[in-house]
Amino acid sequence: MPTTPDPGSEPPARTPRPPPLTPGLSPQPALHALSPQLLLLLFLAVSSLGSCSTGSPVPVPENDLVGIVGGHNAPPGKWPWQVSLRVYSYHWASWAHICGGSLIHPQWVLTAAHCIFWKDTDPSIYRIHAGDVYLYGGRGLLNVSRIIVHPNYVTAGLGADVALLQLEPHDLSNVRTVKLSPVSLELTPKDQCWVTGWGAIIRKESLPPPYRLQQASVQVLENAVCEQPYRNASGHTGDRQLILDDMLCAGSEGRDSCYGDSGGPLVCRLRGSWRLVGVVSWGYGCTLRDFPGVYTHVQIYVPWILQQVGELP
């Protein structure tokens, strides 16, 4: 990572801010359920440690930032809708990656609701990095003008883990939007699907320099297939489903999304084009046997997305 903040952006005016946590897959979605008050306390603790620092900013330790487990380097331009969601770290004096996202419209990004600290968050605390396979490339950052968190969101494990970020006008030419999957289109385990991101490459090992976007092919599974192992692991005996109807499961032996991939895309090749079918949400560890990653099922939220955004490309 470079030793200076990403160019083209100044730190937001209002302080303090929540810390650049890396919400992602965890043994249960407890991390995603942290209250805004607790996030604020965590941020104050981190900020106070660096409040006396002066001079040139130092690199953000990669363990604090964020990869795909079992993946490999993504070719430039293959996933042109992939973006990185950033918040400003006053401790490290740079914009730090917290989550992934997908460009679904030239001015709209779809991500996970748990990547947003609280529903009425000031959009100026976020930036979007787009159009580059390298997490800390030299491209400038895009400003966020509006945030819409799904009104039913409480925590990732309860569903509705989806949010929209509207971007200020920009002139990036090397990005492309991804199509949403039609509501009527059914997914099968035979569909060719890929997950991408800059998160951890194994559970306790972050993506190393030069922080190249990772990709991994995964298989979409029926919800009932992953419901039982999650139920067994949690000791849940009630009637409520753990893998809800607005979620889907995907994974393959040794390949999975992980910490720092949250909010990023799960795309499948459907009807001759790539379609966004899932948003990285939660899971039990990373690549643990019988525990595929859990994603927000984008098809369920297409009507809501269109209601907010209007016509898509």
From Swiss-Prot:
Provide the residue span(s) of the region labelled Disordered: 1-27
Keywords tagged on the record: Disulfide bond, Glycoprotein, Hydrolase, Protease, Secreted, Serine protease, Signal
Report the SS bond pairs: 99-115, 193-268, 226-249, 258-286
Compartments annotated for it: namely: Secreted
Q: What is its main location?
A: secreted
Glycosylated residues (UniProt): 143
Q: Which GO terms describe its biological process?
A: proteolysis
- Residues in Peptidase S1 domain copies: 68-310
GO MF annotation list? serine-type endopeptidase activity
Compositionally biased residues, Pro residues: 1-22
Q: What is its EC number?
A: 3.4.21.-
Protein family (similarity comment): Belongs to the peptidase S1 family.
PANTHER family from the xrefs? CHYMOTRYPSIN-LIKE PROTEASE CTRL-1-RELATED, TRANSMEMBRANE PROTEASE SERINE
What is this protein's name?
A: Putative serine protease 29
Starting at the broadest rank, the lineage of the source organism is: Eukaryota, Metazoa, Chordata, Craniata, Vertebrata
Gene, per the UniProt record: PRSS29P
